[in-house]
Amino acid sequence: MNNLEQKNNTPPLLSRNFLIIGWVVVIGLLTLVAGRWEERQINPNQQLVSQVSAEGKSEVVLQRNRYGHYVTSGLINGQEVTLLLDTGATYVSVPENMAEGLGLRKMARSQSSTANGVVDTYLTRIEYLSIGDLEFYDIAASINPGMNHDTSILLGMSVLKNIEFTQRGDQLTLRLAP
């Protein structure tokens, strides 16, 4: 067999490389799309739009996620965070591994009763927290070492006590309480 016949029987290297690169790009794009779709299932409120009510109050409308929870994007001390509304939490509860990056310092040791029992926590203060145009200052919070696997911050009653809620279907409207 001569060299010419051998070349014709071998798939062109360039075509094979383009095929491999094409499949890598397709798989990468599918992974990216699937990841964003999953994020939207967990937090359908990533792009909040504030509106003004008939009474002239600023309000934010949240869509319930597929698990039945209200999860939203917000800001703590200027940093973007994911918040899970939790009327059973006394304070805003921040995972310990996120606290330093949010500018929170551990103050007094404390304990909190959770669904998993009593846990050691640290009290702290959040200078600024916002959900859309709803803004809150000097908020009582806790730093929870037991939440380090969580990617959401529990938005507890130390903020929620300042909000009026109206739920209709899968939507929860938040506005500042008078």
Q: Which residues fall in each region the model found?
A:
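Pepsin/retropepsin-fold aspartyl endopeptidases
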Residues: 1-82, 87-178
